[in-house]
Amino acid sequence: MKEVVVSETPKRIKGLEFSALSAADIVAQSEVEVSTRDLFDLEKDRAPKANGALDPKMGVSSSSLECATCHGNLASCHGHFGHLKLALPVFHIGYFKATIQILQGICKNCSAILLSETDKRQFLHELRRPGVDNLRRMGILKKILDQCKKQRRCLHCGALNGVVKKAAAGAGSAALKIIHDTFRWVGKKSAPEKDIWVGEWKEVLAHNPELERYVKRCMDDLNPLKTLNLFKQIKSADCELLGIDATVPSGRPETYIWRYLPAPPVCIRPSVMMQDSPASNEDDLTVKLTEIVWTSSLIKAGLDKGISINNMMEHWDYLQLTVAMYINSDSVNPAMLPGSSNGGGKVKPIRGFCQRLKGKQGRFRGNLSGKRVDFSGRTVISPDPNLSIDEVAVPDRVAKVLTYPEKVTRYNRHKLQELIVNGPNVHPGANYLLKRNEDARRNLRYGDRMKLAKNLQIGDVVERHLEDGDVVLFNRQPSLHRLSILSHYAKIRPWRTFRLNECVCTPYNADFDGDEMNLHVPQTEEARAEAINLMGVKNNLLTPKSGEPIIAATQDFITGSYLISHKDSFYDRATLTQLLSMMSDGIEHFDIPPPAIMKPYYLWTGKQVFSLLIKPNHNSPVVINLDAKNKVFVPPKSKSLPNEMSQNDGFVIIRGSQILSGVMDKSVLGDGKKHSVFYTILRDYGPQEAANAMNRMAKLCARFLGNRGFSIGINDVTPADDLKQKKEELVEIAYHKCDELITLFNKGELETQPGCNEEQTLEAKIGGLLSKVREEVGDVCINELDNWNAPLIMATCGSKGSTLNVSQMVAVVGQQIISGNRVPDGFQDRSLPHFPKNSKTPQSKGFVRNSFFSGLSPPEFLFHAISGREGLVDTAVKTAETGYMSRRLMKSLEDLSCQYDNTVRTSANGIVQFTYGGDGLDPLEMEGNAQPVNFNRSWDHAYNITFNNQDKGLLPYAIMETANEILGPLEERLVRYDNSGCLVKREDLNKAEYVDQYDAERDFYHSLREYINGKATALANLRKSRGMLGLLEPPAKELQGIDPDETVPDNVKTSVSQLYRISEKSVRKFLEIALFKYRKARLEPGTAIGAIGAQSIGEPGTQMTLKTFHFAGVASMNVTLGVPRIKEIINASKVISTPIINAVLVNDNDERAARVVKGRVEKTLLSDVAFYVQDVYKDNLSFIQVRIDLGTIDKLQLELTIEDIAVAITRASKLKIQASDVNIIGKDRIAINVFPEGYKAKSISTSAKEPSENDVFYRMQQLRRALPDVVVKGLPDISRAVINIRDDGKRELLVEGYGLRDVMCTDGVIGSRTTTNHVLEVFSVLGIEAARYSIIREINYTMSNHGMSVDPRHIQLLGDVMTYKGEVLGITRFGLSKMRDSVLQLASFEKTTDHLFDAAFYMKKDAVEGVSECIILGQTMSIGTGSFKVVKGTNISEKDLVPKRCLFESLSNEAALKAN
């Protein structure tokens, strides 16, 4: 393990080839034939019976016996295979579907493939084309199969071929039989063979007419024996067309039918001995093996001696089912087996081979992809702010068990000798010693430790206890993202818990209410180096999801900082020095600034304390500049005042690391903010300085709060009397308004909102009123509370809770919401029996007017519990949903990485993106909103660190020239070439076809230049406003020596210079910072962006609410959001819950025009525009009369005449009404003559049978039921369209339903700007690029609606993965099997055994390139540090590189000399 140079390298598996074992292979690898059903030989003292299922030649399962083949014991012998010979062949359940497919493709008489020669040649040509991937190959094979199924007669022997299928569905005995329905052929006249066959039965049927119904069901039974003989006759050339590679011996179709069955080694099916009795419990496989042997021997005996055909078939069926259960016990219901005792009841299924592989606890997921590891510990965690953020306190008793193998060198020999002497029970000590030339470890618990220490040699390895400074990995499950496992330095402490700094809780999502965490100790120097550099806490302060800080101040730290930096915090010198020593352990040097207050005595402010925390002394390089709003920012009263004059000191300004205004709260110190102090230090001065500041802050706040105290009690939430009074007044007013609305509703006078009925309008209005009253009461409550109220302080500084929580405790709890509505009516039209029926009052529908302080009344308590229950269920369901979703995303994206040519590829080298995210930048390094540099902040920083009063300010044109001087050469490098390698002409530069991989870089330089030009323009505008020359252009040559500002008064010059002086130093520094950050933001090759992208989309899912509806601008036009929506998108669902087409109107200002278009789109039924539909019987005629409501048609702006309605009725295909039967009567009536179906009016003649009255009556009723649902206008798939008024006052049409193409083609709609939220519809109408864009847009929309910030690059990657094969593939087992060809990856995901059987049948090869395969085979994957090889230089000069002499060169030279 610790060797630097080894003589033998371990063998590495390059690839796997799958195939089925042929009968010869099964026998060849077998050590013994299992031929008896007896397991133990009773005469030989219950020894395992020879040739039985437990024969010791196949290995042993108990430690006392030894293997009869290799004479090894249980530890050293892996077991050996046996085999058993079946008396008759049986189908293999794994290849059953494939067997049917082969039979469908060949003639059931001569085994020739059912294709013509030309088809054969064409298909073979397609299959043999180089570079055909798995998806294409399976597509071609499906085409071949479909073509064969259509061929009715064999082209080789002329035999008739019908339909081949399974005899029955389900898990009965018939499910494993194949039948061939020779004569069944749809839509063709029957073959002459059928007539002959039917003719043969005529005489039989004449005597036995009851047999007639059975004759129809007569089919050809393709039993395994018959099928085997057919398969043997298949030509090798035809095998390729069936998807089998016949060049390999095991690639013949007959391989897929069992003739010999392998018996697995005994050690994988051990016998469990019973206590105090000689009996043993046998494994399911052993029991099944004995059953198979017994049944096979019965059949063999029957064949030898003669047996009735019925008995014979029953035995054969039983053998078939038993073998199927042995392989896959799910395929057969054990209760259906012939002779099973409990006729059709429930039987415990056995664990067949498939059951051992599949599922979470199966071999693949349980033992290969993930396993339990050594060198790990687990215990409860607790907080310790005195630790540095990159340390973890490890209990000494854990440190004594976890060891690290350290190699003895001349530098550490003395230390390791001391550790050996201490031994395993004293920390620091050692547990084991591995001598250089010995194989076995020596346990230091025993033996003479002094002697061992004395004889310690260089090169020995000592397994010593964990000690301070060792690198360990720390992890908390569930590991939702990369930062759930980080690397810390160990710190050995007493007591029994792991301790960590609270700043690091967020990435682990840990709290201290009993959480446990895991600790792992890497065992090699290389592993330690990788761990601390790649996974170290300091190097992971930001989340790769969006580049925001994730390790930052939390809870108490924020409260402490807020209290220290408050405006009224002043400290004398003693307190100040005490605070400074608190934050530094008393060993750091501080430069104390001058006090803020001199008289009556020296006082320093809390802001000065914090300034020292950021920059303790003049040796510290940290100079940060920052402007940011606090969490609660009240703007200054006058608009003319700057932000820092905020009424509540709510705007932070830091200049040169001095805090000038604002308090330290969550927005400045917490996580998730890109304008926080720690983020600014990190971006400008690196992670070490940010970590130092965070450590100082943790110590200071924890110790400060320990001294000051901070507690919350019942006093803090006791409302004052006037607050109670105000609350009651506000609630009463709201109740009164609600009562007025309810009265209007009951009278039917309530004005409805667009797209809503009266009840929905009432709910919306009452809901609005009640949420408003809660907000008002909340505001009153917050204003009434004292400034030093503990809950209020926590809510204000953002450490815990919100003002809503405070107002719920003090004033009013508010409306309880269940599934987005008020509490529903439970029984008898009311929510609870305490209220009248159909009551809509606030108190009966879940409004809680009490506060938590005053306590809830019983009905309120129940309503509150209902909504609490909903939240609980939601969380539980969501956990499972998002967990599965994350797993699917991870499996689909795991092997994507950035290569050295900047492309994003899968492990099989399929290109997914040409540059990651279009610009090749790392989301982790994004400073702005998905931009690599925040120009404003960088400019302020550059300006402040280069500011010097003596520097001369540049004129506007000089500013632009300086920028050109630096950016010009960079842009000149990025020239554009066309496809033939020629330079692109200047006028063609902006054409879409010349886009290349450097466009993003060009755009960055361009935006940088624009920013500098903006500064120059601002200066020019200021100069113009003061009567000076703008000078955006350089002056003419003849004027260059003259000062342009000569005539300007000095005071104007000075004022301009002081207001806006930009020196050359500032411009150069700014460009230097911006370009450095851009280069640093480039994505490193080898980054596992697929895995990070999957986690970045999966992890926010756990924080989203599950059942979320959102009103898209209009009430009752619900859009699904949250986890279900993300699930729909990534599953590429064909049917989604709320398909909405957003139609942009040509005339979007006019309400009437919008209504006209709505009428064209929304389906209008006859029932919507008809007064009545009545049946009329008179004068021997019967007809249906429909009266149309022309007024409604006019009001709805429907372009509809009565003739159109008549045409629509005749066109309704289901009604089958002739045009001649529909008559228009007058202006608004339509009459439809009614005749029985199939009866023609014109065929009435005297001889024709009169229609019976019943027929007419039934036809009349049928039409009366169906007529109201006839679509007379609009698109039939579209149930509803709503006119939505956007924020900018324009109107758009929101259309519910499918039919994007039809809506786009509707008059009055701008088709090119019409979109839908249904990805597959976009794909079918607009193509794959549009579908990709649609996926990205929809996921972005969903995430932003939940306030989740996810970098767009992750979402783009997901969109590309779903579409890069040219069709939209969902992230599901079906999509994944089309995206990836790797057998092991698919098998480790879902449907394990199906993929393995498929791989064996189609003889797939797995190149072992992807992540899953490498983990299963224990290899390094080609991602991250595995994506390159380190090659060492040999230092051999070229002169020394001469070819070696050949072995017989001297002899041949001598022979040549002799010949001469």
Swiss-Prot record:
| SUPFAM superfamilies in the record | beta and beta-prime subunits of DNA dependent RNA-polymerase
Does the entry feature the keyword Zinc, yes or no?
A: yes
Sorted UniProt keywords:
DNA-directed RNA polymerase, Magnesium, Metal-binding, Nucleotidyltransferase, Nucleus, Transcription, Transferase, Zinc
Where Mg(2+) is bound, by residue? Answer: 511, 513, 515
Tell me what reaction this enzyme catalyses.
RNA(n) + a ribonucleoside 5'-triphosphate = RNA(n+1) + diphosphate
The segments labelled Bridging helix in the record are 858-870
Binding, Zn(2+) 1? 67, 70, 77, 80
Enzyme Commission number(s): 2.7.7.6
Task: Please state where this protein is localized.
Answer: Nucleus
This protein's source sits in the domain of life called Eukaryota
Gene Ontology CC annotation, any one: RNA polymerase III complex
Which processes are annotated in GO (biological process)?
termination of RNA polymerase III transcription; transcription by RNA polymerase III; transcription initiation at RNA polymerase III promoter; tRNA transcription by RNA polymerase III
Signal peptide positions are none
Q: Where does Zn(2+) 2 bind?
A: 107, 110, 154
Q: Which GO terms describe its molecular function?
A: DNA binding; DNA-directed RNA polymerase activity; metal ion binding
What Pfam families does the record point to?
A: RNA_pol_Rpb1_1 (PF04997), RNA_pol_Rpb1_2 (PF00623), RNA_pol_Rpb1_3 (PF04983), RNA_pol_Rpb1_4 (PF05000), RNA_pol_Rpb1_5 (PF04998)
Known function = DNA-dependent RNA polymerase catalyzes the transcription of DNA into RNA using the four ribonucleoside triphosphates as substrates. Largest and catalytic core component of RNA polymerase III which synthesizes small RNAs, such as 5S rRNA and tRNAs. Forms the polymerase active center together with the second largest subunit. A single-stranded DNA template strand of the promoter is positioned within the central active site cleft of Pol III.
User: What NCBIfam families does the annotation carry?
Assistant: PRK08566.1
Q: What does the subunit comment say?
A: Component of the RNA polymerase III (Pol III) complex consisting of 17 subunits.
Further details from the record: Present with 6020 molecules/cell in log phase SD medium.
- Family, per entry: Belongs to the RNA polymerase beta' chain family.
Q: What is this protein called?
A: DNA-directed RNA polymerase III subunit RPC1
